[in-house]
């Protein structure tokens, strides 16, 4: 199955957000929407929540609502794809420094946790592998770096962290959106 919807480009979404004076980066917005989807958001209530969290409850004009709808649909489709097609929307390219990518990743993770926590308010009680992944995400959200570090080494480490975050998000999506099997009902025989 191929992904029919594609994510808006980072620069085009950055422009749409800045034109509407929304103080989030595309990475942060994608993290927020991804967190809500991974937390179990199934309906159009995500838009109201995004408006409340980012725009004082005011709906966005069509110039921003359409790219955000596209972002939501492509992200949802990627998360639900069994081929693990989900990717983080963080800046890429020759003109993007490793420090810019690290900052974007930190913002993505912070907003992912916000979106996830809005739909799963008892995150601190989640155990096992998913609980560990959430704890790791909290640590990654506070990601720091030394600008004197070897940028090539930092870039390699960053790619590993991005991959870990991607897998952790998929793990959360599986945990919070898929129906858990329930024990079969025990029917007592009827005595006549």
Swiss-Prot record:
For this protein, the record's Pfam families field holds:
UPF0149
The UniProt similarity line reads: Belongs to the UPF0149 family.
Protein name as annotated: UPF0149 protein YPO0911/y3298/YP_3608
Q: Which InterPro entries match?
A: YgfB-like, YgfB-like_sf
Instruction: State the organism named in the record.
Output: Yersinia pestis
Q: Mention any one GO cellular component term assigned to this protein in its UniProt record.
A: cytosol
